[in-house]
From Swiss-Prot:
It comes from Yersinia pestis. This is Putative agmatine deiminase. GO terms for molecular function: agmatine deiminase activity; protein-arginine deiminase activity. The gene is aguA. Keywords: Hydrolase. InterPro entries: Agmatine_deiminase, Peptidyl-Arg-deiminase_porph. It comes from the Bacteria.
Length: 365
């Protein structure tokens, strides 16, 4: 497929902005997991879990999945029949971070933003050494959609930003100001680029994300917008837990800020599962290579905040039988009128993320 050339200018100059996740969606995109140096059991448990996530999303939203050519037969045998499989090379399966960020305008037009990608840190803490295929994913998706794209001069993953669609952007300094992303840019310069490419006007900076999150503290595991003026925050009451100070600091910031419209924020506290750790059984057959090794006893960055909003559905990870029910009940309160669907998601967590990380919504144009 001949790739389109990037558009000149920026989305903001052209009247485009990133809508909130609860805006109507035409589709959700995913990628096929196959790396045996990241996913256990030859990636089969992860593939089965991705299929369950896709099935849940597809009840309300069409699902498309990028699949490398050599795995197409396996994907066809595993994925629900109503999921559209698209031949596409990738280095791993994190569509939130490698896929396009879609922007829209008031005239029912949609375009894509292609960020630069360096596998969560490049040679300074990145999670694998070769990410050339991942760099091409966003434009392949936008070309498939026949949407023009902008090429943003910023290393950024989709999981590191959340917006309310009304001018406010939520993020973490731990990730966006990390020297392994854009060391040549200061905070003001990064904010200007986000204004230009997402159409936002106001920033809420949390210092840190979830403890031991190997993405360097992505916001989508820590805090997200529920609707304008309301956020969900990953929370623990255990003062001995290293997460406690992070959540308290975030709560302080959120309690003492306003959004782009001048609203004080309502804060929902979503309880942390666990703490959760991976086991010898879950790590012994993960191959060693140039990727970050998986070893038993590592604390997993499990979080119920890592859910997807898609067309009046909430797809959230089931992670711990002790807290899954509480998370479900809170999500019912947070999203009245939505279908709340839990999917067992430990296999995704073992690979370093969760449901929001493996999905990327395509807003309706």
């Amino acid at each position: 497929m001949l790739q389109q050339q990037a558009l000149p200018g920026t989305p903001r100059q052209d009247g485009f902005f990133m809508p909130a996740e609860w805006a109507p969606q035409d589709a959700v995109w995913m990628l096929w997991p196959y790396r045996q140096d990241n996913w256990r059991g030859k990636a089969i448990p992860a593939q089965q879990t991705f299929a369950k996530v896709a099935e849940a999303i597809s009840r309300a939203t069409p699902v498309f999945m990028g699949v490398p050519a050599e795995f197409m037969a396996q994907a066809k045998a595993t994925m629900p029949a109503n999921v559209t499989l698209v031949e596409m090379a990738s280095d791993d399966a994190w569509m939130r971070d490698t896929g396009p960020t879609m922007v829209i305008n008031g005239a029912a037009e949609r375009r894509a933003v292609d960020w630069q990608f360096n596998a969560w840190g490049g040679l300074n803490g990145g999670l694998y050494a070769d990410w050339q295929q991942d760099e091409k994913v966003a434009v392949q998706v936008s070309d498939f959609l026949k949407n023009a794209h902008y090429s943003a001069p910023l290393i950024l993953e989709g999981g590191s930003i959340h917006t309310d669609g009304e001018g406010t952007l939520l993020t973490t300094a731990e990730c966006l100001l990390n020297p392994n992303r854009n060391p040549h840019l200061n905070q003001a310069q990064i904010e200007q680029l986000l204004c230009d490419y997402l159409g936002v006007t106001h920033f809420i900076w949390l210092q840190d994300g979830v403890y031991n999150d190997e993405t360097d503290g992505h916001i989508d595991n820590m805090c997200c917008f529920v609707r304008p003026g309301e956020v969900a925050l990953h929370w623990t009451d255990d003062q001995q837990d290293p997460q406690y100070a992070r959540s308290v600091a975030a709560f302080e910031v959120l309690s003492n800020t306003v959004d782009a419209k001048g609203r004080k924020l309502k804060i929902w506290k979503l309880p942390a599962p666990g703490p959760l750790y991976n086991t010898e059984e879950e790590t012994f057959d993960v191959l060693t290579s140039d990727a970050v090794p998986r070893t038993a006893g590592e604390r997993l960055a499990g979080s119920y905040v890592n859910f997807l909003i898609s067309n009046q559905q909430i797809i959230f990870p089931l992670l711990d039988s002790r807290t899954d029910g509480q998370a479900n009940d809170l999500l019912q309160q947070m999203f009245p009128g939505y279908a709340i669907v839990g999917v067992p998601a430990r296999e995704i967590l073992l690979g370093g993320g969760n449901i929001h990380c493996i999905t990327q919504q395509i807003p309706a144009a």
